[in-house]
């Protein structure tokens, strides 16, 4: 029995690909037909790939593996954050910072800085600073929280990454490929299957499609672990998901994260 039924895939519109002018020829083997200028994805092949990909996720979760959830496009942000937090997994829903994987040591220094700022504000020590400095520190804290808050408990490189739209998240995929970290992806007809280790061919734009696949992955992880467990080892209730909608971040480099200028 498949993890997801054909009926569920059809109802969520997983079979609708991009316009025929937007496609990657390497994806051809997963395309069923063309209808009115739109590619139709072969859901029989999607089901087979779901079984293969979800078997891997289930096995990895049972072994205590860490999966980094990545989804920065607007329609994926809230869903990805919700499922990552429900399962206790790290996530990126603002812009992917170059080097998040390949230069993880530097990224960890930014996380350490965020923890330092949190301590300053929570302890009240920040009140000893001049007002202008407090404002700058608050802005820095907010930026760091937006860009690295979802990975703050990730003390090592993940065992795999799950990506919604690998074409948009090309840098994340490239970094994972370079380090030999398996890539699991919900990938549409404009994607290159050759850079994805575990592909779920399907609509990566429609909210219902993204939600179906991502939520089922979340269920698998929770079921495999008997409840979520975050990367710091604290238990996470599957129902404890007090999530605010993810904000649409801006692309920045590490220097901008500590700058007092820019978006806050």
Swiss-Prot record:
Keywords: Ribonucleoprotein, Ribosomal protein. This is Small ribosomal subunit protein uS2. SUPFAM superfamilies: Ribosomal protein S2. Residues 243-253 have a biased composition (Acidic residues). The lineage of its organism: Bacteria, Thermotogati, Deinococcota, Deinococci, Deinococcales. GO terms for cellular component: cytosolic small ribosomal subunit. Residues 255-264 have a biased composition (Polar residues). Residues 243-264 are annotated as: Disordered. GO terms for molecular function: structural constituent of ribosome. Pfam families: Ribosomal_S2 (PF00318). Belongs to the universal ribosomal protein uS2 family. The keyword Transcription does not apply. InterPro entries: Ribosomal_uS2, Ribosomal_uS2_bac/mit/plastid, Ribosomal_uS2_CS, Ribosomal_uS2_flav_dom_sf. GO terms for biological process: translation.
């Amino acid at each position: 029995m498949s993890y997801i039924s054909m009926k569920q895939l059809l109802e969520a519109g997983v079979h609708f690909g991009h316009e025929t002018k937007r496609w990657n020829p390497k994806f051809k083997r997963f395309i069923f037909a063309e209808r009115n200028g739109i590619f139709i994805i072969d859901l029989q092949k999607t089901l087979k790939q779901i079984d293969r990909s979800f078997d891997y996720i289930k096995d990895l979760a049972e072994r205590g593996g860490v999966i980094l959830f990545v989804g920065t496009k607007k329609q994926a942000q809230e869903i990805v954050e919700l499922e990552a937090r429900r399962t206790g997994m790290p996530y990126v829903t603002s812009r992917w910072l170059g080097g998040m994987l390949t230069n993880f040591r530097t990224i960890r220094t930014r996380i350490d800085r965020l923890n330092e700022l949190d301590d300053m504000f929570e302890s009240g020590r920040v009140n000893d600073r001049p007002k202008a400095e407090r404002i700058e520190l608050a802005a820095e804290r907010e930026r760091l929280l937006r860009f690295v808050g979802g990975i703050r408990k990730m003390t090592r490189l993940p065992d795999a990454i799950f990506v919604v739209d690998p074409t948009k998240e090309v840098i994340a995929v490239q970094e994972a490929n370079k380090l030999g970290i398996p890539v699991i992806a919900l990938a549409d007809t404009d994607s290159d299957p050759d850079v994805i280790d575990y592909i779920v061919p399907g609509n990566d734009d429609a909210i219902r499609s993204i939600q179906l696949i991502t939520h089922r992955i979340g269920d698998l992880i929770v079921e495999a672990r008997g409840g979520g467990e975050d990367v710091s080892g604290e238990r996470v209730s599957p129902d404890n998901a007090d999530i605010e909608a993810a904000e649409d971040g801006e692309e920045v480099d590490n220097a901008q994260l500590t700058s007092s200028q820019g978006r806050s």
